Amino acid sequence: MFKTHKIEIEWAGRPLTLETGKIARQADGAVIATYGETIVLATVVSAKNPKPDQDFFPLTVNYQEKFYAVGRIPGGYLKRESRPTESETLISRLIDRPIRPLFADGYKNDTQVIVSVIQYDLENNPDILAMIASSAALTLSGVPFMGPIAGARVGYCNKQYILNPHIDEMPESKLDLVVAGTESAVLMVESEAQELPEDIMLGAVMFGHKGFQPVLDAIIKLAEVAAKDPRDFIPEDLSDLETAMLEMVEQDIRKAYTITDKQERSTAIDVLKTEIINKFMSETEENCKFSADQIATVFKQLQAKIVRSNILDTKKRIDGRDLSTVRPIQSEVGILPRTHGSALFTRGETQAIVVATLGTGEDEQYVDSLTGMYKETFLLHYNFPPFSVGETGRLGSPGRREIGHGKLAWRAIHPMLPTKESFPYTIRAVSEITESNGSSSMATVCGTSLALMDAGVPLVRPIAGIAMGLIKEGERFAILSDILGDEDHLGDMDFKVAGTNNGITALQMDIKIDGITEEIMKIALEQARDGRIHILNEMAKALTSARDELSEFSPRIEVMNIAVDKIRDVIGSGGKVIREIVEQTGAKINIEDNGTIKIASADAKTIEAAKRWIHSIVDEPEVGGIYQGTVVKTAEFGAFVNFFGSRDGLVHISQLTTERVTKTTNVVKEGDKVWVKLMGFDERGKVRLSMKIVDQQTGKEITGDNSIKAEKEKYADTKNNPENKRLRKKKEE
């Protein structure tokens, strides 16, 4: 019934299996991939024909994690998987980026790649396996895909690279790098690093590229026995149109690209494009061989050729800069004084307002993943409204691009954050892109660094980012620092590097062509370092380190630690005690399983009140210590006082005052607030307290020759204390 084909190899010490022919047989391509005991299913379906007037390649990659893969039922009301999580969106992009450039130029059939994690062993991360399975399914499908590609994860620990480290090895690694590519070229890199130097990062890329070569061989072997016949696809030949158009508009395009202002340049290009389309389309129907989409496509190709050749020939950029110059930078902090921290970062025509907000444990984000529920304490949200590029558009939940750019900036900042022990706040940074002409994600990195320092977050060091580009024709190439939007679209590489003066914290690379050598990447990294240092120096004109004090509008958090067996005493039955503390003091209190308690409030007195209350519950009173308490019961022989939390002790009638007392209620009544000294314990272990040697107004011990006289005065104070008078009156009512 099934005609299956299976390839198995040993890869990084674990078995990798690729199998096809048994599941999802109606898809154009389907592969079950197994690594260790993690299993994913990848399917590919591509429409037989493009939609009418389709002017782009509609590729969709959907990565989804099934909770049954780890034997769990999803949380929430519906109890089923729903919209993609942030992690699923990021992995979908991770797969999309290296495969998209390898489809044949001009192929516009609707194509969908769906990858499902159907078993997860909690050791082997499924993202790399999903990428490999997608590549294998595409290679088998018959669509014009010039692959295969493969990917690998690289760690760095004890000065050694690790290929595909286990999940439990990652906390010790100084590097989390994913690299993907073909047999001869690197196409994509995504990474987070602990301030590693450029040579270590480049070495990791090449180590990963070498490491996934056996996987490429396995996919090719599977394709040799299981691939479908290639689809008939002949790219459009528009060379005649290109020749004719070049003669007509070359000089006009060159002239338009001498305009340095983005909006003016875009307007000039749009006018020229409209004119050329109208000119070709104005011919009689029988003489016009080309559609408006074809004319627009060739016009875009001509733009790229002219701009690229001009940069290679003159070493000058669209805006007149040389290859390595960074656009003018202006940095400001504290622009929104009632927020916890804020910054405005402007680089040329790219601008970001970044606002930092500090929160408590209640503000941590709960994330439900295949590995279980965890809490995220650093949030970075990137918003790209349409007005930032002078356009109209929808507003709503963030798209894949916004999520991806935000995560890149998150990776750049994350390694430089203080530890939770030294700075126990939840941190949220929001980047509002107000202008964009290239590298808004790196503007977000710079703005976030400044905003966090303005908020008083003690970053290890400031972080900056820069986007690099590449123009390559044959053996000639030019590496561009701080690329414009047009240079990004028309170039061969988008290469983003973020880090500190000491090293790289994040690296993202997308390469559109083969032939990017190790030497080119090395030059690009060195040029990026120079640009990054320049940007850090410019940022330092606004702020060089975290402010000494938090904003007056920020919450204050103090941390205390208690014994684990005391947690239930602080919480109380059904949360009664902790609710009372919160209600009475106004503080926010978060208790962790290890006994760490975080107390938050904008008012220092509130925090101190909550701390005293908790100490009174968990600490043991000391003999000789003086404590404030409440009279809870009176008797002929004395008064029972509740002190130091839930503890009760007896003040014998002889210890109420130095005067002879015939009736306890002549001195105190139930509800009175009194100061007592712990004298010790009787033979039965009962607490013995004394009031007569404590000043009932100040709570200090009475000493010296005037103690008897003072005590007589304080006896009256105890009866006439305004608080006790109020409590008595309330009781009588």
UniProtKB/Swiss-Prot annotation:
Q: In terms of one coarse class, where is the protein primarily found?
A: cytoplasm
> What is the name of this protein?
Polyribonucleotide nucleotidyltransferase
Task: State the Gene3D superfamilies in the record.
Answer: GHMP Kinase, N-terminal domain, K Homology domain, type 1, Nucleic acid-binding proteins
Spell out the family assignment given in the record's similarity comment.
Answer: Belongs to the polyribonucleotide nucleotidyltransferase family.
Q: Does the keyword Kinase apply?
A: no
User: What is this protein's function?
Assistant: Involved in mRNA degradation. Catalyzes the phosphorolysis of single-stranded polyribonucleotides processively in the 3'- to 5'-direction.
Q: What is its EC number?
A: 2.7.7.8
Name of encoding gene: pnp
Q: Which SMART domains match?
A: KH, S1
The Basic and acidic residues compositionally biased stretches are 708-733
A GO term (biological process) for this protein? mRNA catabolic process
The residues covered by the KH domain are: 555-614
Query: InterPro entries, alphabetically?
Result: ExoRNase_PH_dom1 (IPR001247), ExoRNase_PH_dom2 (IPR015847), ExoRNase_PH_dom2_sf (IPR036345), KH_dom (IPR004087), KH_dom_type_1 (IPR004088), KH_dom_type_1_sf (IPR036612), NA-bd_OB-fold (IPR012340), PNPase (IPR012162)
Q: Residue ranges of the S1 motif domain?
A: 624-692
One GO CC annotation: cytosol
Q: Cross-referenced Pfam families, in alphabetical order?
A: KH_1 (PF00013), PNPase (PF03726), RNase_PH (PF01138), RNase_PH_C (PF03725), S1 (PF00575)
Which molecular-function annotations from GO does this UniProt entry contain?
3'-5'-RNA exonuclease activity; magnesium ion binding; polyribonucleotide nucleotidyltransferase activity; RNA binding
Enzyme class, top EC level, equals transferase
- Which cofactors must be present for this protein to function? Mg(2+)
Cell location = Cytoplasm
> Which organism is this protein's natural source?
Bartonella quintana (strain Toulouse) (Rochalimaea quintana)
Region: Disordered; residue ranges are: 704-733
- Enzymatic reactions: RNA(n+1) + phosphate = RNA(n) + a ribonucleoside 5'-diphosphate
Report the domain of life of the source organism: Bacteria
What are the protein's UniProt keywords?
Cytoplasm, Magnesium, Metal-binding, Nucleotidyltransferase, RNA-binding, Transferase
Binding, Mg(2+):
D488, D494
